C-alpha cells in the first residue's frame, strides 16, 4: 500500500504543468489559425450561400450516435437520436428565424474557440467579442443571400443538440453526486464497524498496532495516515477525518480528467461517456446495493466472531468445541480482510444456514461459512439474528428483482412511446409540407392580385385622362353653343334684311348641330361600353372579395373603383343633360326656321296678290304707258319668291312646347 501511494503521487506530478513557460509564438499561431479558419468559412458562406459552420455540430452528432451504438447498444442510441430530433423540432418551430441563425452561429464559433488548451484568457475573450459583433451587426440582418429553408434545420440542430448533451451531462452529474453521498454513508458505517472490530481485539494486539503506527509515522512522517490501510474489502476506510480523498476517488478523478481531455480533443466539449444508459445504471446500483448488504452481513459476522473469541479467551473449558486451532481472527489491520477465521461448522443448523446463503453472491458465501464459530450452537440469540439477516437479504433481493422488472417494463414503454413519436413526426412532416404548399400558392395568388391591381390602376388613369379630355371637349362645346346662340340672335336680327342668307346659315347650323349630336351619341356609346367593362371588372372584384376574405387591400381598391365609377356615372348623366339641352336648342332652331318659312310663304302670297293687282292695273292702263311701264319692270324679278323656299316637309312640330327625345 505504501508503494501505491507513492505511485499515485508520481502519476499526479505531470498533471501540474506550468502554462507560463509556453511560448508566445505557439499561442499567436493558434489564434491566427482560428481567425484564418473563421474567415475561410465566412467566405465560403458568402460565395456558396450556405452556412458551413452548421455542419460541425451535425458531424459531432453522428460521432456521438456511433459511439453510443458501439459502447451502449442500439436501444440507447435510438433513444438519444429521438430526443435530439425532438429538441431540434422544438427549436425549429418556436425560435424565430433571425434569432435562430444568430444563436446557432454564435454558439458554434464560441464553442470552437472555447475548447483550446489555454482556456479563458484575453485572446479568447477578444475573439468571442469579435464573433458576436460580426454575427449581431452584419449577419443578423443579411439573411436574404442564404438558402434559409436549407440552413434552418441545421441551425435548429446547432441549438437542440447541445441542449440534449447538457441535459445528459446534468443527469450524470446528479447521479455522480448521489453516488458520492452513498459512498460517504457506507464509509461512515464501515468506520463504525471498524471501531467495533478494533475495540474487540485484545489489548496486547492494540498495543502492537499502536507501536506499528508510531513506527510508520516516524519513518515516513505522515501523521495524517492512521488506519487508511486497515481493511481492503470495502475500500480504504480512514480513521482520521483529515484525509479527504481515498485511492479509488483519486483514480476516479484522474480518469475524469483524462476523459475531459479526450473530449476536448475529439468532441470539443461533448463527452459521450456522460450519456449513460438508464438501464445499465440501475443494474449497477442494484449490484452496488447487493455488495453493500453482503459487506454489512460480513461485518456483523465478524463482530459476532470477535465477541465469541473474547469469551473463548476468558473460558478455557469451551475450547473443546473448536476443531481447528487456527480460528483466531488475525489482528493485524493490513491482513484482516485477506485472512478470515477458518472455523468449520459441525451441526445441521450451520448446514441449513449455508443452504440459505447459497442463493446470494458466490463471493461472500465462503466468507459467511468461515466466519460462523462453533460455539454459536449454544447461542440461540445469534442464530435468530442470523436468520433475521438472511430474511432481510432475501427481501432486499426480491426488491431488487422487482426494480429490475419495473425497469424492463419502463424500457418497453419507452420503446412504444418512441414508435408513437416517430409516427407523429411523420404526420407532422406531411402536415408541414401541405402547409408549405398552401403558403406557396397563397403567395402566388397574392402576386397575381398585385399585378391585376396595377393593371386596373393603369386603366383608371387612362379613364381619368379620357374623362379630362371629354370635359375639355364639353367646355369647348359650351363655348361654341354660346357663340352659336349669339350668331343665331344676330341672324334673327338681320332676318328682315336678308331672308335668304338667314335660311342658309340656319341650314348650315342645323347640319353642324346634327353632326355634333351624332358625335355625342358615339361618345355616349363608347362611354357606356366603358361603363359596362368597368361594371364587369367590379363584379369580378366582388367575386374575388367573396373568395378571399383577408384581402383588405383589394377591398379598398374596390371601394375606390366604385367611387370612381359613381363619379363617372354622374359625369355621364351631366353629359346626357347637356346633350338634351343641345337637342332642345336644335328643336327651338327648327321651330324658328319653320316659323320663318311660314312668314316667307305669307310674303310670297302677298307678292302674288300684289302682282295680280299690278297686272289688273296695267291692263286697265293704256298700252303706251304699259309698255313704257313694263319695259323697265320686265327684267325685274321679285326678291322674295317661292323658288327659294324649300319644299321638303319637316318632321318637327312647331307647336311643341318642350323637346322630348325618342326613347330607344
UniProtKB/Swiss-Prot annotation:
Biased composition (Polar residues): 320-348
Entry GO terms, CC: axon; neuron projection; neuron projection terminus; nuclear membrane; nucleus; rough endoplasmic reticulum membrane; synapse
Modified residues (Phosphoserine): 305, 332, 631, 634
Chain intervals for the UniProt region annotation (Disordered): 253-274, 320-375, 630-664
Compartments, record wording: Rough endoplasmic reticulum membrane; Nucleus membrane
Glycosites: 324, 340, 452, 655
UniProt-recorded name of the protein: Macoilin
Protein species of origin: Mus musculus
Amino acid at each position: 500500500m505504501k508503494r501505491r501511494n507513492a505511485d499515485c503521487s508520481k502519476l499526479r506530478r505531470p498533471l501540474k504543468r506550468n502554462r507560463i513557460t509556453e511560448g508566445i509564438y505557439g499561442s499567436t499561431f493558434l489564434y491566427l489559425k482560428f481567425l484564418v479558419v473563421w474567415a475561410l468559412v465566412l467566405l465560403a458562406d458568402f460565395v456558396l450561400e450556405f452556412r458551413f459552420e452548421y455542419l460541425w455540430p451535425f458531424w459531432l452528432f453522428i460521432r456521438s450516435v456511433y459511439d453510443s451504438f458501439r459502447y451502449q447498444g442500439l436501444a440507447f442510441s435510438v433513444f438519444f437520436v429521438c430526443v435530439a430530433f425532438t429538441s431540434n423540432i422544438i427549436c425549429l418551430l418556436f425560435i424565430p428565424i433571425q434569432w435562430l441563425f444568430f444563436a446557432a452561429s454564435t454558439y458554434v464559433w464560441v464553442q470552437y474557440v472555447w475548447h483550446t488548451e489555454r482556456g479563458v484568457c484575453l485572446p479568447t475573450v477578444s475573439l468571442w467579442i469579435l464573433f458576436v459583433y460580426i454575427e449581431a451587426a452584419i449577419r443578423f440582418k443579411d439573411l436574404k443571400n442564404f438558402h434559409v429553408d436549407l440552413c434552418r434545420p441545421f441551425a435548429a440542430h446547432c441549438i437542440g443538440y447541445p441542449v440534449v448533451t447538457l441535459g445528459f451531462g446534468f443527469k450524470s452529474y446528479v447521479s455522480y453526486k448521489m453516488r458520492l453521498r452513498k459512498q460517504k454513508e457506507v464509509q461512515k458505517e464501515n468506520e463504525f464497524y471498524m471501531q467495533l472490530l478494533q475495540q474487540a481485539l485484545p489489548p496486547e494486539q492494540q498495543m502492537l498496532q499502536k507501536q506499528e503506527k508510531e513506527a510508520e509515522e516516524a519513518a515516513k512522517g505522515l501523521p495524517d495516515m492512521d488506519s487508511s490501510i486497515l481493511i481492503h474489502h470495502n475500500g480504504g476506510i480512514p480513521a482520521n477525518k483529515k484525509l479527504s480523498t481515498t485511492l479509488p476517488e483519486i483514480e476516479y478523478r484522474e480518469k475524469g480528467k483524462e476523459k475531459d481531455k479526450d473530449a476536448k480533443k475529439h468532441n470539443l466539449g461533448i463527452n459521450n461517456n456522460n450519456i449513460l444508459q438508464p438501464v445499465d445504471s440501475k443494474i449497477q446500483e442494484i449490484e452496488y446495493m447487493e455488495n453493500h448488504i453482503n459487506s454489512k452481513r460480513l461485518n456483523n459476522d465478524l463482530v459476532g466472531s470477535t465477541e465469541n473469541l473474547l469469551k473463548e479467551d476468558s473460558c478455557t473449558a469451551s475450547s473443546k468445541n473448536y476443531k481447528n486451532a487456527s480460528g483466531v481472527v488475525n489482528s493485524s489491520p493490513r491482513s484482516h480482510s485477506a485472512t478470515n477465521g477458518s472455523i468449520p461448522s459441525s451441526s445441521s443448523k450451520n448446514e441449513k444456514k449455508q443452504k440459505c446463503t447459497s442463493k446470494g453472491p458466490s463471493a461472500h458465501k465462503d466468507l459467511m461459512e468461515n466466519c460462523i464459530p462453533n460455539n454459536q450452537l449454544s447461542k440461540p440469540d445469534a442464530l435468530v439474528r442470523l436468520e433475521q439477516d438472511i430474511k432481510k437479504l432475501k427481501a432486499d433481493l426480491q426488491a431488487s428483482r422487482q426494480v429490475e422488472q419495473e425497469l424492463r417494463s419502463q424500457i418497453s414503454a419507452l420503446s412504444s412511446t418512441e414508435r408513437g413519436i416517430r409516427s407523429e413526426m411523420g404526420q407532422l412532416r406531411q402536415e408541414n409540407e401541405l402547409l408549405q404548399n398552401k403558403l406557396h400558392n397563397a403567395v402566388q395568388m397574392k402576386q397575381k392580385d398585385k399585378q391585376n391591381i396595377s393593371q386596373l390602376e393603369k386603366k383608371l388613369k387612362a379613364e381619368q385622362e379620357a374623362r379630362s379630355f371629354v370635359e375639355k371637349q364639353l367646355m369647348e362645346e359650351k363655348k361654341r353653343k354660346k357663340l352659336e346662340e349669339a350668331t343665331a340672335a344676330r341672324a334673327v336680327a338681320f332676318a328682315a334684311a336678308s331672308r335668304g342668307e338667314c335660311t342658309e346659315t340656319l341650314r348650315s347650323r342645323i347640319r353642324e348641330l346634327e353632326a355634333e349630336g351624332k358625335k355625342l351619341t358615339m361618345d355616349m356609346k363608347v362611354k357606356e361600353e366603358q361603363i359596362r367593362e368597368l361594371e364587369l371588372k367590379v363584379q369580378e372584384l366582388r367575386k374575388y372579395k367573396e373568395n378571399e376574405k383577408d384581402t383588405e387591400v383589394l377591398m379598398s381598391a374596390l371601394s375606390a373603383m366604385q367611387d370612381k365609377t359613381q363619379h363617372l356615372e354622374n359625369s355621364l348623366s351631366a353629359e346626357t343633360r347637356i346633350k338634351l339641352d343641345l337637342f332642345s336648342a336644335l328643336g327651338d332652331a327648327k321651330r324658328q326656321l319653320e316659323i320663318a318659312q311660314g312668314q316667307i310663304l305669307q310674303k310670297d302670297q302677298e307678292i302674288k296678290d300684289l302682282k295680280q293687282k299690278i297686272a289688273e292695273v296695267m291692263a286697265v292702263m293704256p298700252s303706251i304707258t304699259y309698255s313704257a311701264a313694263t319695259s323697265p319692270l320686265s327684267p325685274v324679278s321679285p326678291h322674295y319668291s317661292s323658288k327659294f323656299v324649300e319644299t321638303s316637309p319637316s318632321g318637327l312640330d312647331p307647336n311643341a312646347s318642350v323637346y322630348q327625345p325618342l326613347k330607344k
